[in-house]
Amino acid sequence: MEDTVIVGRHAVREAIITGHPINKILIQEGIKKQQINEILKNAKDQKIIVQTVPKSKLDFLANAPHQGVAALIAPYEYADFDQFLKQQKEKEGLLTVLILDGLEDPHNLGSILRTADATGVDGVIIPKRRSVTLTQTVAKASTGAIEHVPVIRVTNLAKTIDELKDNGFWVAGTEANNATDYRNLEADMSLAIVIGSEGQGMSRLVSDKCDFYIKIPMVGHVNSLNASVAASLMMYEVFRKRHDVGEI
């Protein structure tokens, strides 16, 4: 199986810290060592090979801004849904998962993972078809959060929603019409929040499975938000409802 390339100091640092299998770290020639001291120290501690390479090689591998650092790592693995449910049952307190219905932009997924980590979301569920996967671009956009938030890839979102309901989750769909203001969202239950695709929103089969619908009110001339922005607002609203000011 071919290595996956990740780039950027945050993504590489988190991959090392979390123990993700790393074949090699590539450092740009001439980069100031004080900028990557933590990466170099952790790599040495874990006996990871560090190789200095020309900037042109990093440019070729990354095809994106790389901050002078890249790593060749084992491909990202998806969490198993059944195992995920088993692990969640062992936790105390209310749970939150995101269901991304047809999201295709890797930058959006990376940004969502970053906010999911910040707000303590327990997992993110994506479908196997017509969806972004875990890639180098997602890893960099997540600034390392990809190492901390379980991503579950499933064949059938509608069936997965049924299983979540059987395990005590209430499912909230995001919808522009006939929906409750998200600021009135009740968060005193385990929640699965569905975010639709950038262009089409939720699919009908998924929408029909939702227990209720929430919307983000807008007063401007553009009547939609980027999927990662909408997801972030939802995640932080749940976080706000469950944590008092000053608690964290």
Swiss-Prot record:
InterPro entries, sorted: Alpha/beta_knot_MTases, Ribosomal_eL30-like_sf, rRNA_MeTrfase_TrmH, SpoU_MeTrfase, SpoU_subst-bd, tRNA_m1G_MTases_N
Keyword Disulfide bond: no
This protein's GO CC annotations: cytosol
EC category: transferase
Keyword check for Methyltransferase: yes
Signal peptide: none
Gene3D superfamilies the record matches: 3.30.1330.30, 3.40.1280.10
SMART domains in alphabetical order: SpoU_sub_bind
CDD domains from the UniProt entry: SpoU-like_RlmB
E.C. code: 2.1.1.-
Annotated positions binding S-adenosyl-L-methionine: G196, I216, L225
Example GO BP: RNA processing
Superkingdom classification of source: Bacteria
Keywords associated with the record: Methyltransferase, Transferase
GO MF terms held by the record: RNA binding; RNA methyltransferase activity
Family: Belongs to the class IV-like SAM-binding methyltransferase superfamily. RNA methyltransferase TrmH family.
Name used for this protein in its record: Putative TrmH family tRNA/rRNA methyltransferase
Organism: Staphylococcus aureus (strain COL)
